[in-house]
């Protein structure tokens, strides 16, 4: 009996030692990665550091000094040269995302009737597999909250795709909507309205501005409802949203007008000067941005008409005329029409 207890005690000690070694190794790797981010070459002071994964070394790209050695590569042990090879060899799923109601952590039964070895499923088992696949789809959305999220997030994805918004905006919008659901802000409001308001808030947070009119075009609710819901959720969730800058609209408007980088740079310069003199305060950012682009296109010899600029910016020609006259007068810009 005593001998058995000794064996158990020694096994426990051995396990604790292994855990301590693993923990120490992880901490060391974290420290090394943190140091590597801040590291500079002690020989020449360069920050151009290159990870040589074949030799497991951290090397200065300028003078060739080996700064660190024997670091562990935590990536996969296999290599893939195209998408098909990557899909075949990968043993994990897609990363977690807030744009799916279950954050992408649930499983699904593939529609290709094949087993893990790639062999075709027998016809005798296909009926059972069909039933399993059907019930697996059902249990992914099991209650009212999940159904709400599934519908709202699909709406967010549809609107974001129609507006050509990047992945970061979609993730931010999904997080805003989830917070609204957690605080029970959806009650008494349409799912489409809250989703559109969350997308508008995410655009402002990520400095990828879209106007309420643009959001209205791709949503199924009115501009008035989007604005009202946006003000409500931004107040209740205490969202920190800075006023939209006209500069944020310049790249998109210039791209829509097929203008060169010189015009874009000149437009940004005009807007910065206008901001310093507080000429942008109390005015719509799209109108000011459109006026700056109109002036810059004339100065750089790539003239666009007021109608063309107005169509891309979603404002009227009168707005552009008023704003460009103000900018030209206050900034002493001579425009030859």
Swiss-Prot record:
Sequence repeats lie at residues 154-237, 248-329. Zn(2+) binds at residues 41, 44, 60, 63. Keywords: Metal-binding, Repeat, Transcription, Transcription regulation, Zinc, Zinc-finger. GO terms for biological process: DNA-templated transcription initiation; transcription preinitiation complex assembly. InterPro entries: Cyclin-like_dom, Cyclin-like_sf, TFIIB, TFIIB_arc, TFIIB_CS, TFIIB_cyclin, Znf_TFIIB. GO terms for cellular component: transcription preinitiation complex. A zinc finger (TFIIB-type) spans 37-68. One of its GO terms (molecular function) is TBP-class protein binding. Stabilizes TBP binding to an archaeal box-A promoter. Also responsible for recruiting RNA polymerase II to the pre-initiation complex (DNA-TBP-TFIIB). HAMAP family: TF2B_arch. Belongs to the TFIIB family. This is Transcription initiation factor IIB.
